[in-house]
């Protein structure tokens, strides 16, 4: 079966984005370190892989002819015919017995020319002729029941036209023909179910009772094939679609995916809602109210259309399961992709550290325990006013005892710890110190006296000093040019000084270095 993949998955695979422009911020280097455009590239590669895998799956779906060759559709026809003819043959009174020709005209009118199943009318009419010849009483009962139901439906729903009623009768008379419709011939149903009106549910109670006869055999034989969401047998938009239970592995995968997306959304939305507890409570209340409304709506739909949708649930999911899986996976990927983009932008622009700091402060302030909690955890002891007064009195008594044990002033003076001083005595002491210092300064010896005593010996006393005008720093002077004899005399003088005049410790004499003669 040549069928192109759904057009919804094509524009979602975007090209690789260029790296962001450098910003003059403190955390501009984080963008170059983490390289978020590489994350986007990896995400796009994953999206491409998933879309290619889904395209392969859709390309590998089997057609109607292959299923007939394998014998699956013939088995379903036989089981449905045997189940439809056997139970409760005499329960409904026969009002009219239409002939095979009238039944053929009804079924040909029931198949609309614009419907996808109009191509197989010849084969379906032959099957109906065989079944009507074999069981004329059953066909009469079924046609009379369907005509009565059409009358009731016409009274309840005046907007419904004749072709829809004929399609209803045709679908009831030939249930195997609805099973033979392939996935390529059926239009894709809407992904979200619409609530059915009560009038249509009342009008089709008898229809669902007969459709339940075919449900047992068809569901038992086609459980691995039929799964998920299926179209209605009449093709009318008023009858809703119901999801059949998926296998446990698929359910676990979808649960994990839903939990991951919910965690990401809560983490990003919680940052805005944490600041104001009132806003957070409003969000929780609105979320719980919406969940309760959704549960009530689901329960109403399930009670109204449970019996009529069991027959339609098996086939529609087989036809649309790839589209459903594709849409859910792409939604999750888009959410994760948008979250990563927001995180990368916040890292590059420098807003993430500020948000984290504010969140940490808010969390610390929010998690501060109250006085009651501290008392409950026995960290802050519970005390009454009387107990507090007693504790204060005990502390006062301890302080008064310590103050009474302090020594008196007389005792401190006697121990020479505290000295009584007057201004006159302090001035006299200062005057004595000044006189002593002046006397010492006046008695200082002069430079000549120090030289005589050989106490003050400066560098200028034993070195010839030249005046600044006569001194030249350049070394190319005749008295700086030493000959070999002058150098030898200098070395000899140094050796004599070291050996005779220089005092060296006996243990370190061997370390004295002499110059060569």
Curated annotation (Swiss-Prot):
Family: Belongs to the phosphatase and actin regulator family.
Lineage, broadest ranks: Eukaryota, Metazoa, Chordata, Craniata, Vertebrata
Composition bias, Pro residues: 187-198
Residue list for modification Phosphoserine: 188
One family name in Pfam for this protein: RPEL
Region entry Disordered, spans: 1-24, 41-247, 260-320
Tissue specificity of this protein: Diffusely expressed throughout the brain cortex, with highest levels in the cortex and the hippocampus and lower levels in the striatum and thalamus.
Organism: Rattus norvegicus
Matching PROSITE patterns: RPEL
Name of the protein described by the UniProt record: Phosphatase and actin regulator 3
Assembly, per entry: Binds actin and PPP1CA; thus inhibiting the protein phosphatase 1 (PP1) activity.
CC per GO annotation: nuclear matrix
Biased composition (Polar residues): 92-129, 157-172
Residues where Phosphothreonine is found: 29, 194
RPEL repeats: 52-77, 359-384, 397-422, 435-460
Compartments where found: Nucleus matrix
Residue ranges, compositional bias (Basic and acidic residues): 54-68, 260-300
Top-level taxonomic group: Eukaryota
Residue spans crossing the bilayer: none
Entry keyword set: Actin-binding, Coiled coil, Nucleus, Phosphoprotein, Protein phosphatase inhibitor, Repeat
Swiss-Prot/TrEMBL GO biological process terms: actin cytoskeleton organization
Keyword Electron transport in record: no
